[in-house]
């Protein structure tokens, strides 16, 4: 379309204008296309246009060329509709934005934990809720994300723009459609021929070049940031390729507006390498701790189901490193992993989400059920869980009270509530194995068996099974007084035996009695 277009050849739906006064459309990379116009309307339509406008009001702009052909130059949704009256004349001013804005409204918090997922699959997963929305992947070439990716308090548009920047590429809205549509990266093969213009400007974007080199954008040269600004009657879109002054250039910005009653298009043209944004990161995630539940454990890594989303592929989800108290490269340190279904936190120390790691199992008490008139105080049994990684979670059940059997009964000095005293440190597994360090004692227990080392009462060993003591060398027992109590005591050495039973027996090759 290379004909001169005037006001009468512009149609803006759904508005019927008596006369169009001002009109402007701005299209650029990495942003939504925007349109504004002001026109005179009939007095009887003013309330209809203002009051009936909402987020579903779709705006279409067509121009009709000299051959009678209609061409769409903008489609979008109304953002602001205003009517003002000057000397009895009713003016309508409308601001609209392209349909890609629908991706830029709601913020999301969700994770993508499948390293084998391709960027193209991720793009389609994000835009799937938007009906017939379309995103054309022009840059990733089927590459997999290869790591953990987090969308944290970002709109889908912000998230997609950030992902595209990791390929040093922009998002480009396609505005001629009634649904969100965009290019993920600079399109190829959209050659629109040569532009002839005797009026143009040329400038060098020195600041943008410095920013690109300081942020290590690969393959850029200072000549890539020479930009031309030309006027043309051709209708072009950002991402289109043209030839100007013998160079292949891309349209990076298109401004369409009325000048002296003629529709004029002003384009900014740049080399392809000059339209390469620096890598963008989500810096709001720095220092965030996000709760999740452990669903898998292997060596020093865990699999996590985040509580903020429901995206989890059990076969291919991501393994997070678990931060332990101490670990070193020579395989020394403290190895204590959480258990499955434990609540845990994922910590993000930097703006790179792939650098996150798991830390700190978190005890969460189950909420007590609401009391009913029929319930008695004795009809509720509450269990709690000790601190440290591992173990079953707290539970509350409506059942008759059952006497508990635990280390607290074996040793009355041990409290059932292991978090009652901050001075008492405990390490307990879900199988009931426990080490307790109190100011006045140490307790190592397993069910009904325990070893108690008490400052006041000494050492107590209690076992429901055998106690075996084996020494490869000498064993020395020394005490002021020693008492051994058993149904039968037998001492053996080199074929000699002393038996203390209902009768006392001495068996040896030689027995001397003095």
Q: Where in the sequence are the language-model features?
A:
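Amphipathic alpha-helical and helix-coil boundary elements used as assembly
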Residues: 1-514
